[in-house]
Amino acid sequence: MQQSKEERVHDVFEKISDKYDVMNSVISFQRHKAWRKETMRIMDVQPGSQALDVCCGTADWTIALAGAVGEQGKVVGLDFSENMLSVGKQKVEALQLKQVELLHGNAMELPFEDNTFDYVTIGFGLRNVPDYMHVLKEMTRVVKPGGKVICLETSQPTMIGFRQGYILYFKYIMPLFGKMFAKSYKEYSWLQESASTFPGMKELAQMFEQAGLERVQVKPFTFGVAAMHLGIKPESK
């Protein structure tokens, strides 16, 4: 029986959890850290605020958010891979971040009331969900009016020449890195597939608006290899 996308993604991340952080750095040539840092600068997270990190994985962005909201704030990280969460919990415990809670859950059905968080983020996770729009609407539902929904994700470069090189890298080189460093050729082939079919920057910006967000900002990184999308939930009328 053929696996659903959700089942396949779950299997992938359960298997690569112990090598995920190392491979993130290898695949992006360490650029993912700079992308997240610049995204956090644009977000301008306020101390004492409440944040949700959807598809938090091993909790790197969750931890960055915790530093921004401080001890008076609260950050919830949610992921459906228990193995990825286990790695994240070890980091959170080592840093003694009492303002962080990590939950096992599904991005398609966020277990929170409407209008709960000031910021809702998803980093390198939206391309892996079964329905992009449904998850964006869920994120919009749980963010407060005036709050921000942010996606940091791989994208589709538009520069001629660079785009072709990017496609070749993701299709052929990245799975080889997965085999060399994580013994996971098949799993990293999936990451290539999910990235290659993900919407481009303009299309994703339109999806943010269709999900009910306004004042959508788009920030490309490294010639469009990745991009930040940020939208604001309209104030209640």
Curated annotation (Swiss-Prot):
Binding site for S-adenosyl-L-methionine: 58, 79, 106-107
Annotated signal peptide: none
Gene Ontology biological process: menaquinone biosynthetic process; methylation
Catalytic reactions on record: a 2-demethylmenaquinol + S-adenosyl-L-methionine = a menaquinol + S-adenosyl-L-homocysteine + H(+)
EC number: 2.1.1.163
Keywords (A to Z) from UniProt: Menaquinone biosynthesis, Methyltransferase, S-adenosyl-L-methionine, Transferase
Associated pathway: Quinol/quinone metabolism; menaquinone biosynthesis; menaquinol from 1,4-dihydroxy-2-naphthoate: step 2/2
Enzyme class: transferase
Family: Belongs to the class I-like SAM-binding methyltransferase superfamily. MenG/UbiE family.
Function: Methyltransferase required for the conversion of demethylmenaquinol (DMKH2) to menaquinol (MKH2).
Stated name of the protein: Demethylmenaquinone methyltransferase
